């Protein structure tokens, strides 16, 4: 039995929700280990649709332990709203079924205010933040001024910590010409939310160690994607945490050997939300068609996603930097009916062909894709549940992707429906 980490191998929005739901039905524990409530996904179980952004996917399934690890930045108000929403749909959420690491950093209302004020001040240089305070909260964590969940139970230190926070952030807001945060109002907001969120606080590393020793199946659920990783992504157009699977251990309080299989969720084409380099982006009718067929709009923000051809260079890089064992290829059915498909196999940069995405911002914006062209297929792949159901040209496309990214396709998804999945290997099996 192997514990599994699920991560995105592109810029997020790869279809992790369906795959994580499929895997979480077989896991005992589901752990979120990084990010905040800036990325979301939709689960459909029976006739009920659940939109989650902070809660682990296992929360909607009875008998599963859901864990929010120390690597997550938690907005208590957003978390409680999400809990209320799924409770209204019949899901039981209690401090016995949901644990939040007592040492996780909190997102407070001031973080959203700072996030939005700074993004507005950037003008044409916006980085595409959701404005929900995730970046500023991570900054406070690294700068050692964050208020953590455990602090809400300690009145002796809480007010001093709030003073320290406001000294820093109100200076920023003044400099940006934005309204300052009122201390009394912030303290009242914290006092109101504390008794509602503290029951979920737990010594998460200890509970996960107990689960490991009991040989429970643990699923680590990543948010966003490898190319949004703060170190390995298209910096500065990235998120504020490490999204690669290596962070599953640090972000949950477990050792580096805890993950036995890393599954990289990979869309059969490429999408991106917000600003930043996108070598294979299509701004023509083909790109528009991909977006319409794939329903490429954000779960949380509703923002339209940019669309383009599959970028094997980028995915291979994500596989290497993220330790991905195998990929789950999603949305193959979106490519049905295209007479011709293209896959990026290299970049042209300064007169040479390179096979990696450069780290420099100027170089990332300047690379031009080198394509390999494939014959498309007219038949439908939607709902296929075996290789025999796929057109030969679709099989050829998938096999060539495996060769180019240097990793096997472990799962193949052919529709949003949970059971429309072709399984080549069970990630939970050793």
Swiss-Prot record:
It catalyses: IMP + L-aspartate + GTP = N(6)-(1,2-dicarboxyethyl)-AMP + GDP + phosphate + 2 H(+). Its EC number is 6.3.4.4. GO terms for molecular function: adenylosuccinate synthase activity; GTP binding; magnesium ion binding. Mg(2+) binds at residues 13, 40. GO terms for cellular component: cytoplasm. Homodimer. Its main location: cytoplasm. Keywords: Cytoplasm, GTP-binding, Ligase, Magnesium, Metal-binding, Nucleotide-binding, Purine biosynthesis. The active site is at 13 (proton acceptor), 41 (proton donor). Pathway: Purine metabolism; AMP biosynthesis via de novo pathway; AMP from IMP: step 1/2. CDD domains: AdSS (cd03108). Plays an important role in the de novo pathway of purine nucleotide biosynthesis. Catalyzes the first committed step in the biosynthesis of AMP from IMP. This is Adenylosuccinate synthetase. SMART domains: Adenylsucc_synt (SM00788). It is found in: Cytoplasm. The gene is purA. GTP binds at residues 12-18, 40-42, 305, 331-333, 413-415. Belongs to the adenylosuccinate synthetase family. InterPro entries: Adenylosuccin_syn_GTP-bd, Adenylosuccin_syn_Lys_AS, Adenylosuccinate_synth_dom1, Adenylosuccinate_synth_dom2, Adenylosuccinate_synth_dom3, Adenylosuccinate_synthetase, P-loop_NTPase. IMP binds at residues 13-16, 38-41, 130, 144, 224, 239, 303. It is an enzyme of class 6 (ligase). It comes from Rhodospirillum centenum (strain ATCC 51521 / SW). NCBIfam families: PRK01117.1, purA. It comes from the Bacteria. Substrate binds at residues 299-305. Its cofactor is Mg(2+). GO terms for biological process: 'de novo' AMP biosynthetic process; IMP metabolic process. Binds 1 Mg(2+) ion per subunit.
């Amino acid at each position: 039995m192997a514990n599994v980490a699920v991560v995105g191998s592109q810029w997020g929005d790869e279809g992790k929700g369906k795959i994580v739901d499929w895997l979480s039905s077989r896991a005992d524990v589901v752990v979120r280990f990084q990010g905040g409530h800036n990325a979301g996904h939709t689960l459909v179980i029976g006739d009920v649709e659940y939109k989650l952004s902070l809660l682990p996917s296992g929360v909607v399934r009875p008998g599963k332990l859901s864990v929010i690890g120390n690597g997550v930045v938690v907005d208590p108000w957003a978390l409680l709203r999400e809990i209320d929403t799924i409770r209204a749909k019949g899901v039981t959420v209690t401090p016995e079924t949901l644990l939040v690491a007592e040492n996780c950093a909190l997102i407070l209302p001031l973080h959203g205010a700072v996030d939005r004020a700074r993004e507005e001040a950037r003008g044409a240089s916006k980085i595409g933040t959701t404005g929900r305070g995730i970046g500023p909260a991570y900054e406070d964590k690294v700068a050692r001024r964050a208020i953590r969940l455990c602090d809400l139970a300690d009145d002796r230190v809480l007010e001093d910590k709030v003073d320290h926070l406001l000294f820093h952030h109100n200076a920023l807001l003044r400099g940006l010409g934005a309204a300052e945060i009122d201390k009394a109002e912030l303290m009242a907001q914290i006092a109101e939310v504390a008794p509602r969120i503290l029951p979920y606080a737990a010594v998460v590393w200890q509970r996960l160690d107990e689960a490991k020793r009991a040989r429970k199946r643990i699923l680590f659920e990543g948010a966003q994607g490898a190319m949004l990783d703060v170190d390995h992504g298209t910096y500065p157009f990235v998120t504020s945490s490490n999204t690669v699977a290596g962070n599953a251990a640090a972000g949950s309080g477990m050792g580096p050997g805890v993950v036995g299989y890393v599954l990289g969720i990979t869309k059969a084409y490429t999408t991106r939300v917000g600003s930043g380099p996108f070598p294979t982006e299509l701004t023509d009718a083909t790109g528009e068609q991909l977006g319409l067929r794939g329903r490429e709009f954000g779960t949380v923000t509703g923002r339209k996603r940019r669309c383009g051809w599959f970028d094997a260079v980028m995915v291979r890089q994500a596989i290497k930097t993220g330790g991905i064992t195998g990929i789950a290829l999603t949305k193959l059915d979106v490519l049905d009916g295209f007479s011709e498909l293209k896959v990026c196999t290299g970049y042209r940069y300064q007169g040479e062909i390179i096979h990696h995405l450069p780290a420099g911002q100027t170089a990332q914006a300047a690379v031009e894709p080198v394509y390999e062209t494939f014959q498309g297929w007219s038949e439908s792949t939607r709902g296929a549940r075996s290789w025999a159901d796929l057109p030969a040209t679709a099989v050829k496309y998938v096999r060539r992707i495996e060769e180019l990214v240097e990793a096997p396709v472990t799962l193949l998804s052919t529709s949003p429906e949970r059971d429309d999945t072709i399984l080549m290997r069970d990630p939970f099996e050793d």
